[in-house]
Amino acid sequence: GNPGKEFANNRHNLGFICLNRWALDRERNFIEGDVFDYLVLPRAVLIKPKTYMNRSGEAVKQSLKLWKISEYLVIYDDIELPLATIRIRQGGGDGGHNGIKSLLNVLAPEDLKRIRIGIGRDKELAPRDYVLGDILPSEWELLNPVIDLTGKFVDLYIKYDFNAVLNEYSIWKKSCSGTESSGNISPKEENSDKGL
């Protein structure tokens, strides 16, 4: 995501929105830092980089100096996925996403776990204008359950591990496979970097 109130409800800030909702629902508060805001938990550290999306790797580099972090779970928006869909995977390339490219300059691909949330695309707008636009009320309606589900994934990751997240994701996919009316369309192949 991007820091600052002007970006708070942008589609491109969906990762921050998920973490903020997670913290609010669990009555936790992020501590403000210079390079990132953070929340230290017994088995994890949640960070929200203040370096802007395309320089997220700089914040990760700083976090590695403070804590012994062996892997990262990154939550971010994906313009190539239909609105309110989710893809979860480990490793892979940047798929043209500059924020992920920045992270991969610091981390090995296998150390990067991902939750990608679809924001859809407006073919009338340039991609940059679309991702930096605010989430519309009709989009919130579809995204709110996905944001809550992402919070559940974060809980599982913190309490157990990434495999627990993948198991819950598999159950979710089966339960909503092909359910287009709710916006929860079962994702395609998980190992593809296309559309990252």
Residue spans for each PLM region:
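Hydrophobic alpha-helical segments within soluble ligand-binding/sensing domains
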Residues: 96-99
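Short glycine-enriched, charge-decorated loop/helix-capping segments at active-site entrances
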Residues: 87-93, 131-135
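Nucleotide and nucleotide-moiety/phosphate-recognizing core
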Residues: 2-91, 101-115, 122-126, 141-188, ...
